[in-house]
Amino acid sequence: NSSLQVSNKGFSEFSGLRTSSAIPFGRKTNDDLLSVVAFQTSVIGGGNSKRGVVEAKLKVAINGFGRIGRNFLRCWHGRKDSPLDVIAINDTGGVKQASHLLKYDSTLGIFDADVKPVGTDGISVDGKVIQVVSDRNPVNLPWGDLGIDLVIEGTGVFVDREGAGKHIQAGAKKVLITAPGKGDIPTYVVGVNADLYNPDEPIISNASCTTNCLAPFVKVLDQKFGIIKGTMTTTHSYTGDQRLLDASHRDLRRARAAALNIVPTSTGAAKAVALSSQALRGSSMALPLRVPTPNVSVVDLVVQVSKKTFAEEVNAAFREAADKELKGILDVCDEPLVSVDFRCSDVSSTVDASLTMVMGDDMVKVIAWYDNEWGYSQRVVDLADIVANQWK
């Protein structure tokens, strides 16, 4: 196991490019590539100790190099003194496609890093070589040979103990699922209940992007005003699980053309939001509407509260939390903005203060924006950092 010693590590260090060890890399064989990855892993974190730097980094593999997998890598790359070291990616599309889609992104723009393929089984990111493997069955992945500590499970497929457990069978020590987990898998939302993280758990979930938006400001509402019951609608950008044109899908609504329709679908956010408000356990409902935008979504929450209040007081509670315990997680916006303005927002949710309403004195309506890819991926990195900093 990696021996980690961490001091004074924050979760909001998103600025700047991550410094990576790098060595000259020419044409290599597969064995040479493994040696390079092993070499880089051994020297990262070496030398004199610095404040906020771990002595040994957690070896991380990304399973599924889609929207969240690539966003995660970009977010991690932008962190200073990360306790994580991404050394492997499992992607079925091949090295050329993986490197191209990492470098050029229709939503995020061009990645400010030198990205290129390395032979047929690696990509280089600013000189750091990451091995790329390809197998749809996690049991067959070389996690044991690579000494993988943590797998970022980003396929959306292996979300129960049996599926995610295949990574552990393959030799990984722990798994972090970037989707709602099924069954009894522990779910953690940074800023809400991540302080309760149990390092003895080998498999955990980072919940959904909508839960990560909703839970922080629901926590504030419940603590300040007492939530009785509520309902939530998320107007959500379409995702890769929908169809570009009408085509077969197990969900008949998602079978319809994503760019032409408003598509009602399902979400586990109502269940997961009980993490931040016991009052909402079994007394809340949620409806997602997928709309023809590629990124950024917005939550519309209406709750009945026990303490009489007014809009300015509600916004004041959000501002206080955003400046203190939820700094870097929650934000408040006073400008008349639209969805694209929240693209690449680092926070989990941004309350639109001008749209906060109180009906009577006990029914509160809150609108909050979130980048359902980038903001969520920042929280995946945060939770992975927590796993690293409490490694056992």
Curated annotation (Swiss-Prot):
SMART domains: Gp_dh_N. GO terms for biological process: glucose metabolic process; reductive pentose-phosphate cycle. Residues 1-56 form a transit peptide. D-glyceraldehyde 3-phosphate binds at S208, C209, T210, T239, R254, T267, G268, R290. It comes from the Eukaryota. The keyword NADP applies. Its EC number is 1.2.1.13. The active site is at C209. Plants contain two types of GAPDH: cytosolic forms which participate in glycolysis and chloroplast forms which participate in photosynthesis. All the forms are encoded by distinct genes. This is Glyceraldehyde-3-phosphate dehydrogenase A, chloroplastic. It comes from Nicotiana tabacum (Common tobacco). The gene is GAPA.
